[in-house]
Amino acid sequence: MEALGSSDCNLEILETLSDDAIQEITESYDGFFTTVESLIAGTGDSLVEDEFVSHVYCLCKYGLDSLVRDHFLRSLEQAFEKGGASSFWQHFDAYSEKKHHNYGEEIQIVLCKALEEISIEKQYHEKCLSIVVHALQSFKEQSSDDRQNSDTERVHLFSRFQSMLSSTLMTTLPQHFPEILHWYFKERLEELSAIMDGDGIEEQEDDCMDLDEKLRYKNGEMDVDEGCSQGKRLGHDKLVKNIGKVVRDLRSIGFTSMAENAYASAIFLLLKAKVHDLAGDDYRTSVLESIKEWIQTVPLQFLNALLSYLGDSVSYGTTSSGLTSPLACCPSPSFSRVVTPSEGIVRWKLRLEYFAYETLQDLRIAKLFEIIVDYPESSPAIEDLKQCLEYTGQHSKLVESFISSLKYRLLTAGASTNDILHQYVSTIKALRAIDPAGVFLEAVGEPIRDYLRGRKDTIKCIVTMLTDGSGGNANGSGNPGDSLLEELMRDEESQENVGFDDDFHTDDKQAWINASRWEPDPVEADPLKGSLSQRKVDILGMLVDIIGSKEQLVNEYRVMLAEKLLNKTDYDIDTEIRTVELLKIHFGEASMQRCEIMLNDLIDSKRVNTNIKKASQTGAELRENELSVDTLTSTILSTNFWPPIQDEPLELPGPVDKLLSDYANRYHEIKTPRKLLWKKNLGTVKLELQFEDRAMQFTVSPTHAAIIMQFQEKKSWTYKDLAEVIGIPIDALNRRVNFWISKGVLRESTGANSNSSVLTLVESITDSGKNEGEELLTGEEEGETSIASVEDQLRKEMTIYEKFIMGMLTNFGSMALERIHNTLKMFCVADPSYDKSLQQLQSFLSGLVSEEKLEFRDGMYLLKK
């Protein structure tokens, strides 16, 4: 618009000119047109140039300099559009339908040739433009002493020419050309990476060395290492020079951003492939430092050498065309190392490292489930992930991805509760290294906790995992004999020690450093859990949180401990004492008081048993069929402090019954006025059964022993008679007898009455090696326990509230779980008051539903109709 306005103004001047002046302008204008065409077409000589300059002088004399500029630039544009641009794009027409993997090596030659041709044409047009600029500058210098304005003329015209050139090419740009550039830089950078990594050096040495170097190498004047190093350097320089020439030519035609985007995307693609190659599926080795070293060795050295070749380090970002590159850098003494990194190289380094961190982070997050399964062997991968997240701050991506993996791979019906718990503990340990405060661990663990709360065996599995000797790992790793509880207590102690040191053993300088490193809690943090800097991950607390309260865990442990103690054949309780002491530290002495009393019962039982046996050694001799007290070992329980014990009637054989009576009498003598009340169905009995052809040993329950001992006097029994003698129901007898039948000791046959079966002792066992030395732990084999389970105890305790619940549902029709819970707490305040948790109530109501007393629909409980 500025040029057009200037032309209008100059045309008004023509009205004031004489006829001779107008005639001179007309002749000069015609000559100017003719000489412009000759110059641009390349058909002119020095005489034409002199004539052209004289015509420019004449037109400028009459104020028509803007006409000169506009017409010449428009003529250049038309010529370039018909010739240079069209010819340039024709080189790439053959690749419009090809995919990048079908380009082949010839595309490199085609690209270089096309750029060389268009650069030559551009240089010629610039030469023509320089003639115009020189003519305009000469006229202004003669008419004015303002040298600065004449320099501005040159900058202005060349800037307009460059814009015209770039816009002409961009408006005719084929869609596949950026892809061709990307492919070219990708191939060249892969070749460069192979050189820097030492691959393919031998093949390239002959091409890289000049004749003198080849002769020196052949004659032995150059050693092998020097030759390889020289070959690598020359190969690098040659490749960078070729790439630099392409980039320089692209810049010269206005494709600065396109070129930089092409080789930048190629660099990032190569870096991504390198990260994938180094990381792989090996989680036991840290790869972050190797990736950073590769970035320094290949991409940054290439960029430093490239920008130095392009002259950016000298001109500080100004190209020959006057455009500034955003990748400009300062000079470097050598391509092999950056002594003083420029601002451009520093920016590139930050970009590449961030991309590497993000790529490695995404790889590790995608495989986080496998990494945690292999923890702690996969600790290096966890440490890499931690550093990546600290750099990128994308913790939320980890949370979302890992929760999705958990729901798809772990929280399924096919996964056992034990496996889920072990994975949960490993998750806590691994993520604690990434997030010591546990902010993101809370979000990751929530789906696992919600899922486990819906499984009936969760409490039992947690207690078993805490107290067994596998170290809390599914594969049994860890210190032999160590329980997960011991491991967690050691971890907690180490965390507390670290915190203690931080709080009380820091000087003022360190305190200032700690204060300067303080960061606010992330937005995901729960403010109710305290500040991040004062919070630590409590694994045991997280396990307890699954259950709902520590009382439930302690009750389950009491049941499990009671079962273990009752099944012991000796008084070795060191492991149990150690576990109780650890639980006391975490849950308090009051919670574990009953467990301590149970252990003290075992200790007292051992002492009492020893005293009774000592007293029996001075007694009278044994009569026939009489059993010695030495064969009996008792466990004396303080019943009020033990969980409810399963009791069933059992009539023992006479000698055994007398032995128990004698033992009780001697206990009464020692512990007057206390008396023993035998639980005859509990305990274990060691038997040796002697047959005609062999002897067999078993360790069985008292009921099993009572059954087989009845066959000592009588070889055959009916089920009814045997049940009456032993004093147990027939259905209970059926379950126990199956054991002896399966061992080949008893045989079942049809009696005289077809409706009754007879059990007969097998005197001779044909399969002599079948069952020798076999033992039985009846509680585990038959699914029976000596102690009532927590569920059974809860059902018994909750029975008194069943009528209240039925009455509420009769009055209100249907009620939600929370409403039933709150109503019971409000009205059941008399002894016994309602003190159950929401989970316990839900478990009891589920039992009523299974008994078809209630229905559960749409989250509401109602009476079964």
UniProtKB/Swiss-Prot annotation:
UniProt entry tagged with the keyword Cell division: yes
Phenotype of null mutants? Gametophytic lethal phenotype.
Q: Which Gene3D superfamilies does the record match to this protein?
A: Cullin Repeats, Cullin, Chain C, Domain 2, Winged helix-like DNA-binding domain superfamily/Winged helix DNA-binding domain
Kindly list the GO CC terms recorded for this protein. Answer: nucleus; spindle
Q: Which keywords has UniProt assigned to this entry?
A: Cell cycle, Cell division, Mitosis, Nucleus, Ubl conjugation pathway
- Any keyword rRNA processing? no
Q: Which family does it belong to?
A: Belongs to the cullin family.
Q: Know the name of this protein?
A: Anaphase-promoting complex subunit 2
Instruction: Please tell me the species this chain comes from.
Output: Arabidopsis thaliana
